[in-house]
A protein has these predicted regions:
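Hydrophobic alpha-helical transmembrane segments
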Residues: 1-11
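Alpha-helical transmembrane segments of multi-pass membrane proteins
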Residues: 9-16, 117-118
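Peri-catalytic and regulatory segments of divalent metal-dependent proteins
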Residues: 15-91, 95, 100
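Short, hydrophobic secondary-structure boundary micro-motifs
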Residues: 61-62, 108, 145-148
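Catalytic Zn2+-binding segment of zinc metalloproteases
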Residues: 92-111, 140-143
Length: 150
């Protein structure tokens, strides 16, 4: 009986680790020359891989690809049409998530079911504010500036 639970737990862990790679199935890797070089020179960018794919819900998102990588997937139409300033801010925002290890906390909260609790959801929402502050620090742009561009 114990082997059943051990096997089930192992399968659950493998599934959740493999699910982190799902956004990359139809995404294409972005060459570093298309992104802001000064932001890619930062230490946080060493373990970040950038991709472009179909993601109509936001400009970009970052996810943890265990054990080492953070992947950032840009929306294809956003990446094609966005101004260089907006791309710079979004890259800095996603690097803020990587620097603060937000993707690991978010993955853990979702996989364990803790994301259902209001206190944890508030913590996850504050992560966006932290990443915005990091991007503002790196680029000098405030998030409100880009709301005028839409």
């Amino acid at each position: 009986m114990i082997w059943f639970f051990v096997t089930l737990t192992a399968a659950w862990v493998v599934f959740n680790v493999a699910a982190s790679y799902a956004p990359l199935i139809i995404a294409e890797r972005i060459s570093p020359g298309r992104l802001p070089a000064e932001l890619l020179a930062l230490g946080e960018a060493r373990y970040v891989r950038f991709y472009v794919g179909n993601n109509a819900s936001s400009y970009a998102f970052s996810a943890w690809a265990p054990p080492l990588w953070t992947v950032v997937v840009f929306d294809r139409s956003f990446f094609r049409k966005a101004s260089p300033e907006l791309v710079r801010f979004v890259v800095a925002h996603e690097l803020g998530h990587a620097a603060s290890h937000h993707h690991i906390w978010r993955w853990f909260a979702v996989v364990t079911g803790l994301a259902l609790f209001p206190a944890v959801r508030r913590m996850l929402a504050r992560q966006e504010q932290t990443a915005d502050a990091y991007a503002t620090f790196l680029t000098g742009f405030k998030k409100e500036f880009f709301s005028q561009l839409k």
